């Protein structure tokens, strides 16, 4: 499988490392508007046996984003700001037919993406939203005590 990571900021660093170290991906691509920043970010990551590919992308260039997504098996959206980028990325994932994991914490973008549910289901696309720190991990902290009862 091949994974696409959109964005190269602070939240992308552990995601890139995890994807590279899991062993289930034969390739990871980091796509960003800032390829030089991506190179600098990747240079700081320890313990990588190989390097991810880097591509320049503007997530608002729908045709280019869909084409890039189609070359991968899953997309992880870490390209902020969420209020501006989450919805176009979700629409592109549906058009590409590629599953999407998104860390968006923006409630308005979340509502817009949830409104795409039927379209995503019809396209056979799974979209996982709010998988950042908060919401995301904090939901697990809330639910964990209840799961133990």
Map each language-model feature to its residues.
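Rossmann-fold NAD(P)-binding glycine/threonine-rich loop
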Residues: 103-127
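Conserved Rossmann-fold cofactor-binding substructure of NAD(P)-dependent oxidoreductases
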Residues: 55-74, 78-84
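Conserved N-terminal Rossmann-fold NAD(P)-binding element of oxidoreductases
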Residues: 3-9
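N-terminal Rossmann-fold NAD(P) dinucleotide-binding loop
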Residues: 12-13
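ADP-ribose/adenylate-binding Rossmann-like module
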Residues: 81, 92-110
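Short beta-strand element of Class I
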Residues: 27-29
């Amino acid at each position: 499988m091949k994974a696409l990571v959109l964005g190269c900021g602070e939240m992308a660093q552990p995601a890139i490392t995890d994807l590279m170290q899991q062993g289930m991906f034969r390739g990871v691509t980091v796509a960003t508007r800032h390829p030089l920043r991506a190179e600098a970010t990747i240079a700081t990551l320890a313990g990588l046996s190989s390097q991810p590919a880097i591509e320049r992308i503007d997530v608002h260039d729908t045709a280019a984003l869909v084409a890039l997504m189609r070359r991968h098996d899953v997309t992880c959206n870490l390209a902020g700001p969420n209020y501006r980028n989450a919805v176009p990325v979700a629409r592109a994932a549906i058009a590409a037919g590629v599953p999407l994991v998104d860390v968006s914490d923006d409630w308005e973008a979340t509502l817009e993406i949830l409104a795409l549910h039927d379209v995503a289901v019809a396209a056979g696309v799974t979209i996982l939203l709010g998988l950042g720190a908060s919401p995301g991990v904090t939901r697990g902290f809330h639910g964990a005590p209840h799961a133990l009862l």
